Amino acid sequence: MKKPSIGFVGVGRMGANIARRLADLGYPIAAIYDHHEGTATSLAVELGSLAAKTLPEVTAASDVIFTVVTDDAAMRGIFAGDESLLKGAAGKVFINCATVSPAVHEAAEEAATAAGASTLAASMASSLTQARQGTLYLMVGGDAAVFEQQEPLLKDISSSLRHVGPVGHAGKIKALVNMVMNINTAGLAEGLGLGAALGLDLIVLKEVFSQTGANSRVLETDGDDMLAREHDCYFSAAHAAKDSGIANALAAAAGIAVPLSHATEAQYRKMIDLGLGELDKSGVAELTFPDRAGA
């Protein structure tokens, strides 16, 4: 069966690795666009693709377009105006992977439908390694028939794939996933930081955490990095602040108090203010350990 031609809009760390994965599997990567032209050109040379100068070029060259942009404003921008992705988009499919507000996903779906195109929101609960290996955890919202049509493609980049309902539900679930993850990360940083201040053996403390109710997935992924101050970026503090903010806005709209999430967002925004926003989220430990820059 012929594989669809694929376009990419937004080829930062995650987008680029998804593109590489699909290229490895023989999908034609037809066109690549990024706000930073050099980023698009570099990946296009690597994959033998067109480095598109405009968004309509991506649409024209591709059957399916993945968008992996940074925030609400970027997502709105690529679907708005006469020279957007929706120019000549009839029959095309957009798979929107960014963590953005659910209302933005819904607006993109409405605009695409009016242009004769289809959309899915494919929210990712994974990081760079999983994107490159094709083992993403994907929560997909959108029309069930469109999901079924694109399921073989989505399976090629994921190890866990589920359809979660309407397009906005994917964004809501992803916001809550990241809300809880960020709270766990900030809480772990406080626990380990307090342990350091109390003069405890942090290796022993971390082992005790792992064997008790203090255990978490974040302890496995970030605990050693917090101790070693190794904060190479897989998921940045700036993105953590953004995503906690999305969840907090949803909570406000629902009339639900989420004080822990607000405190967590404040910690990550403090990192940004201190110039630490591009550290990995584990870098929140720089605010909680004694004798570290942000403590």
PLM feature spans:
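Rossmann-fold NAD(P) dinucleotide-binding segment
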Residues: L55-S118
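NAD(P)+-binding Rossmann beta1-loop-alpha1 motif at the extreme N-terminus of oxidoreductases
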Residues: M1-V68, K92-V93, C97-A98
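Active-site-proximal catalytic alpha-helix in oxidoreductases
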Residues: G134, L138-G141, R162, P166-L198, ...
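Interdomain hinge/lid region at the active-site interface
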Residues: N215-K281, T288
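Rossmann-fold dinucleotide-binding core
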Residues: I6, T99-N178
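Hydrophobic beta-strand scaffold residues
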Residues: I29, A51, T119-L120, L161, ...
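Hydrophobic residues within alpha-helices
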Residues: I18-L22, A108, L153, L194
